[in-house]
Amino acid sequence: MKRNITLTTLALACFMGMAPCKTKAQNTVPSASKDVYDFKSFTDTELLERFAELVEKKRKYPTNEELKTWGIYEELEFVRSHVRKRNIMSRTDRLVSDTHAERDLLMNIPCGSGKTYGGYPSHDFMSDNFSMWNYTNLFGAWNHGLFQAPGSWADAAHKNGTDMLSGMKFFDTTGGRQEGSGNWKNFITTKNTDGTFKYAHALINLLRFLGLDGINYNWEASGYDDENVIKFHQELYKIAQQEKFDNFHIMMYTSNSSLSTWNSEALWGKNGARTTELMLNYSSSDFTHSMGTSVQAAEQALGTSKGLYAGVWIVSMNRSWSRLNADDNARKCGVCLWGEHSESRFWSYNTGGDPNERMSNYQMLLERAFSGGNRNPLTRPSISNSGNDWEWSGTTPPLSKFAGLATWIPERSAIEGKLPFSTYFNLGNGDRYSYKGKKTAGPWYNMANQDIVPTYRWLVVQSETNTVSNAIQPELTNRDAYTGGACLQLNGLSTATSTDIVLYKTSLKGTQGDIYANVAIKSGKDGTNPSNLYLIVRIGNSTWKEYPVGDTTDKNWTEKRIKLDGISATDAIERIGLRVKDCNENYRLLVGKLEINDGVKATPSNIKDLTIQVKEETKTSLSVKASWGIDAQGANGLQGGLVYNDEGNIDHFEILYKNGENGRVSEVARTTQWAAYVGNIQLPKESDEPYIGVRSVSTDLKTYSPVVWTKIDRANQSDLPVAKDNPYGTVELDMVANGAEVAQKIRYITDFKTEGAEQDIIYHAEQPTGGANYVDATDKVIKVKQGQTVTVKFKGYEAKDNVDGSHDDLRYCMGKGWLDLDGDHLFNPADLTADPNHGECLFHLGKVRAGSPEQVQGLVSHSFTVPQNARKGMSRLRIVFSDAWFAGSLVPIGKFNKGFAIDFGVEIVSDNAERPVPADTHDQGEAAEPEGLTTTGITEVAGAASALQVTNEALNFNNVEKAWIFSVDGRLVEYLTSPQSYRTNKLAKGVYLVKMQNKNVIRSQKITVQ
């Protein structure tokens, strides 16, 4: 496999690439920093050293003060998972009966996009929100170093009964690479004076402190079969068993494509002592032929093949899928999908014309991969080793002919126990945050706000039968939301009397009182209209009960409370679904909430130690990172370890916002972590007073803790940057994607001109723009008339090996151009030629995974005709290039991969009738205040904004109670209390990070000492 850059290397490079303040007289604004996360202190060996020191002191876990000294306190809660992993229910009643009941799936792929920072909460709506946990046993987090996988992804996994590995340790000496395991081998085999392994207890304690479930190896080098390495790994399993850490894993991947008696002790175990779990290397990128014999070797060594996976490289899906059921032994072998290092092939291959279309396509691509090409696990295409194409073929979507992983892997559900059950069908992201249908905040991404996923995607049948129905097609969409950023959309395809969508396999019982449901729906139609929707639940093995949801009375979201007569607390609810009666091809309904509850009551633990970090502050906006604790202690909490949410009767947390002490309260985020990021809070007035509040929500879903509020004092307006407001949305280079630095140097447009317009323009660039690799050239305005044909010509910079050291320029990109023709400040993804009434995509150039030298060796020419009814006034032409190997990032808004973007102004003139501005179908108006607010909220005393003035001789602090100075490698250099001034001659030359705390608000600033 290709080299995986280590956390230390990447974090150091990222840190050094930031623009620090040099030690000359200058006022700095720490809160203006755009560097949201700082993981340079999360190196595996350093953390293990820290935890080994605690073991020597007869302790397992660190104090908060120690965490601050280590430099990880502010980021820690973004790495931890406080969601207890749910247990998987029996799979004996699996949908596809000829699958092996215990066969498991390992998704050994990245979480999120980009090394180190991928998957962490952000305001990037267009982000990887993998959701097929209903088939996944174990997730690999391939793009993160050990102990640094995002806790938000672990939360999503744990809710669905999936284990999350903590990240990767990478060794590869194949093909002459020099990435050996010697240093790591020597480190982990270090022993104490009594002969015990120094870091064994430390590693287990560290994982349990983080709430992550194991470690992941790519060990394509020597050393894994070293006697002491074997004993160390076996000792880890022994300690985990003693600690009742029952879902601990060591996932091993080596050059071996088979398990046998000669390597089983190193790669599997011996005499009842497990060494590792194993991903069998692929054979010529395909499944190994040795699945059956490897299963036999595993059973001979440990009596089980659980934890053995046959790997396949999913750069292509045309693989030998038929080998998976070659014989009875092969059928027992788990399956592992691998690919790739910084983002998964599912995400990089997925495309869409705009962010919403790409996100919808992503969920449907996942469904075809897992449930089969028909997106219904009950009716799958036949097994084929070819024709399983990643790309669209005309109007045929990718993987439409694939049999689906459901052919071999049984579905999984972890929804058991006591009511309540609730879902908003959230996927972990949104182009806005909505509360009861109305917008409260902007774009967001947080996998800790992904709801439990449906067990079946999608089990659509004729009512109360196992006969497949094609009358209704469900989909998860981000185009609207009741609360959060997504909802379930039901689309009618044909006429049918009654159709069931079976969503969840469950084993749920009530606690007390009447059982009821809350269901939120939206028809988008004015007036009173029948929803034709029924909630259905199956009691026991066979009895279905249906309950009408009722009519909609307008086009907006409405929430219905439904009494579930005939169900008592002793009845076991085994299936939950929806039924549509009398549907036709015009049927369309959104479902934004499905909750089943009863009279249960539980008091949630209170919030404590709320800390706010201010980021990305401008004159009119700011972002916040919040972290907190709770006043509960579980079994581990008594020793200073991890406390699970359920030990505090907590289902989730709500992040609230108000402008002014008595301002109107809005819910702006939810999470199951003890941390949250809320981006770009708008503060249009200098007098605005932002308050951030956090409260816990009970497991009963109707009881709340008091809100803990913190006022955010603004930095001086004169010192803050002006927000870059782009009415057409931000488009920028993905800085954590591979090759970003190459794009900044040699991927850009040098020449652009128009011909045939009322007013033509000429643009020329002598050098790259760098940074976000976006050029705002809207001061150059093209004037066009309705019905006029215009030609655009442009050329990319041609890089030369002897000049630039590379020719990796725009020839290796694909590009698109869009023109807003209806005045909605959006870019309709449809092609203008194919759809002249709606399309706004003018051209598409380049080839998938191939070079196009003509893009840099001469002017590329494209002509288009402005529609006769184009909306008059000022508009925008946007051109975006993205790497040809990452076609999914070629969209008009968001982050492009290793590419370039430029905007030009356009003025449309003439006297023809103009097309209307498309209606915004979201609910309009101000959102309601959150439920359960009381006057007993707690407002913590705020402190003035910390400030740092840097001179040639000193660091001068203002409004700082505590300060920490860290070196570039994360080492604490100095801890200061109530500092006024600090002499810089105490510091060696170099880059430092200064963290300053006043009350419970933290700001950070980088400095350079020269």
Regions found by a protein language model. Name each.
Residues S718-D920:
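A broad "non-catalytic interaction surface" signal
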Residues T6, M18-K24, G932-Q1010:
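C-terminal outer-membrane/trafficking sorting elements
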Residues D98-S290:
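Chitinase-like catalytic core of GlcNAc-active glycosidases
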Residues P443, L488, T499-N532, K560-I562, ...:
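Extra-cytoplasmic beta-strand recognition segments
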Residues N470-D500:
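Short carbohydrate-recognition loop motifs
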